[in-house]
Amino acid sequence: MTIIIAGKNTLTLTSLAAAVLALGACGGNSDPFESKNTKPAYLGAVAIASYDGASDDLLTAGLGKTGLGGTAPAVADPLKPTPAELRRLAIFNNYRAILDISTNGGYGTLYGPNVDAKGVITTGEGKIAGTEYIAYSDDGTGRQNITMMVQVPASFNPANACIVTGTSSGSRGVYGAIGSAGEWGLKNGCAVAYTDKGTGTGIHDLQNNTVNVQNGVRTDAAAAGKNSIFTAELSASERAAFNAATPNRFAVKHAHSQQNPEKDWGKWTLQSVEFAYFVLNEKYGDLARDGATHLKKLTPSNTIVIASSVSNGAGAALAAAEQDTQGLISGVAVAEPEVQLAPDARLSVKRGASVLVGTGKPLYDYFTLANLLQPCAALVSPATNAFNTVNAATATNRCSALKANGLVTGTTTAEQAASALAALVAAGWQPESNVLQASHYSFATLSVGLTYANTYGRFSVKDNLCGFSFAATGAAASATPNAPVPASASALATSFGASNGVPPTIGINIVNNLSAGGPLLDAASLSAGGVQDYNIAGALCMRELATGSSANAVRVRQGMSEVVRSANLRGKPALIVQGRADTLLPVAFTGRPYYGMNKIVEGTASRLSYIEVTNAQHFDAFLAFPGYPERMVPLHRYFIQAMDMMYANLKTGAALPASQVVRTVPRGLTGAVANPIAASNVPPIKTTPAAADQITFANNVVTIAD
C-alpha cells in the first residue's frame, strides 16, 4: 500500500500490521469465513500522523484553549509555509469561524477545549492526543479528490466504540467541523470522520497556474497533477485566452468544479464513515490467517455512529442517513441544516397567525431573492440593524432600481425599504431576522448565491456567469482602486489555512466584469449611467437563473433538482436544532419543513425531534459583531446538548426530547457592553417541554409554539 508520510511521529498502516503480527500468530483463527478489513477502492494513499497532545494535538494543533482564543499562529516564512503550519492555521481559523471566541460569550465556560465532555470547566488547555489519517476519495481521474480525514483520539476504546461524522460546514475544507462535531467527538473518545464534501480550499490561480495540493501547499498545477485539490478544466490555450481577456482571476472548487458536489454530500459522508471503519480495524482488528490483513473487529453492530455537523455539513449528515442502505449510521444530531425538499403542498407550517403551505423554497431561490431585496430592506432601521455596513447611498439606489423593475412598491426610499423587508417576511424569513438582514447581505448572501449559481449549472470559470468573476482588487487609496490586481503571494501561500472556500476570502473578491468603464469590485461597481446600486443587473441575472427560462436557467434548475432530499431517515433517531432568527438558512425553508415531511414520509416510524431556539441565528461567530451579542445566544450550546442526548439515547436508551421551542434570554447591555452570558440565558432542552413550548404535528400540519 502506498503511504504518504505527513507530519511528525508518523507510522504506516503496514507497520501497524507488522507490530501485532506476533500476537495474531499466537492465537490463530479457525473460522474459515474470515471477515477481512479491506481498503475501499475509492480511497487513495493514506497520510498518517500521530500527535502527542502536548506540542501538537488533534483538536487545537498544539494551540490549546488559550491559543485558539488568541492571535493567529505565526508562519516562519509566509511565502513558504510548511504543511504543519498550514494545518495549524486551518484548525485555528476553522474553529473560530463557527464559534464565538469571547469569554463573555461562553468560550471557556459553556464550550471550548477546556470544557470537558461532561461540561465541567477545567484549568487545562484541552489538547487531545491521537492519530490523524487523510486521503482522497476519487474515481481515478483526480477530478473529484474529495478530502477525507479520520481522527482517532488516544482515548478511543474499541470496547466502547463510537464514530462521529464531521462533514464541513459552508464550503470549508476538511477541518471545517473541527469546532463542532470534531470537538464533541474527540472529547467523548470517538473517532471523527471528516470530509470536505468536494468543496474546500481548492483555489486555482489561473494567471500563474498554481493550486493547492492535499497538504495545503501551493505548487504548479502541472506538477501537482492528481494531487491537486482542484484544477480548473481548462486547456492551455483556453487558460491563455481567459487570462488575456480577464487577467488575475481565480477558479474555486465549489463554484467551478463543474460537478455539483452537493448531490453527493450524503455519499461522501457515508464514505468518511467507511474510511473510519477501515482505519479503526487496521488499528484494532486481529490479524487474519494470512498474517498480512486485519479482521473486521468494529462493525455497525458494535459501534455507535452519530451523523452530525452544522449547516452544509448538517445537510450532508441528513442526506447520508437518508441514503444509508448498509446501516452504518445509528443516529443523527445536527444544527441549522442546509437541506432542500421537493415541493409538496400536503404540508403546512403554522406559527401564530402565519401559515406557510408547502416545503419552503430551494436554497438558490431564496438566496437570489435575498440578494435583490436585502440591501434595500437594510434601510428600514439602519441605526438598529446589527453590524450594518450597507452603504446608505448605494442601498437607496438599489431601492430605486427595485421599484423600476416592479419588485417593490412605494414612492419614497423609506416606503420602498419597508416593501422590501415585508417581501422577505412574506417569503418566509422570520420577523426576528429583520435586524440581521443587513449584516447577512454584507457578508454572505452574494457570495453564497454566486457559488451555487455556478455549481448547480456546472459552469466553468471561463463562463463568467452573469458577468461575475473572482479576483483580488486594489485598495480604495491605490492607483487602481477596486480594479482587479495580482493577489498577495503570502495570502495565496497560506490559503489552505485561511480560506473558507467561498470568495470573498483571503483577499480574493467578487468582481463585476460588466461595470461601466471596466471591471470593478462588485460592491463598488457602476451600473448604467455610472450609478452605484450594488450591481442590479448582476442580481437580476442571478434571479433569472432561478425563475426564468433561459438556457442557463435550465442548467441551474437541473442542478437544483439533483440536491433535493427525501426526509426519510429510515426510522433512525434524529435531532435537529436551529435558531429561530436564522437569516442565512431560514427555519421556514429548512428545519421546519424537513421535520414535517419526515412525519409525512415516515409516519409512526419517525423518530425525529425538531428543536427551535429563540434568540439564536446561523453564525455564532457573528456574536462578536456589534449589535449581535446583546440580542443573540450561541446555538452551539444546544448543538452540544443535542449530541449528548443522542449519544445517551444510543448508549443507554435514554429518552430523546420531544419537539419544542427553547426560550432563551438575551444577554442585554450594561452601558454599551454586552453582559457576560450566564446559564439563565441558555436554559436546557427539556425532555418533556411545557405545553406552551411544544412543536406538534397532526393532519399534515406542523404547529410551532409562537
Swiss-Prot record:
The active site is at 311 (charge relay system). It catalyses: (3R)-hydroxybutanoate dimer + H2O = 2 (R)-3-hydroxybutanoate + H(+). It is found in: Secreted. It holds the Pfam family 3HBOH. GO terms for biological process: butyrate metabolic process. Pathway: Lipid metabolism; butanoate metabolism. GO terms for cellular component: extracellular space. Its EC number is 3.1.1.22. Its main location: secreted. InterPro entries: OHBut_olig_hydro_put. The keyword Cell membrane does not apply. It comes from the Bacteria. GO terms for molecular function: hydroxybutyrate-dimer hydrolase activity. The keyword DNA damage does not apply. Keywords: Hydrolase, Secreted, Signal. It is an enzyme of class 3 (hydrolase). Residues 1-27 form the signal peptide. Participates in the degradation of poly-3-hydroxybutyrate (PHB). It works downstream of poly(3-hydroxybutyrate) depolymerase, hydrolyzing D(-)-3-hydroxybutyrate oligomers of various length (3HB-oligomers) into 3HB-monomers. Belongs to the D-(-)-3-hydroxybutyrate oligomer hydrolase family. This is D-(-)-3-hydroxybutyrate oligomer hydrolase. It comes from Polaromonas naphthalenivorans (strain CJ2).
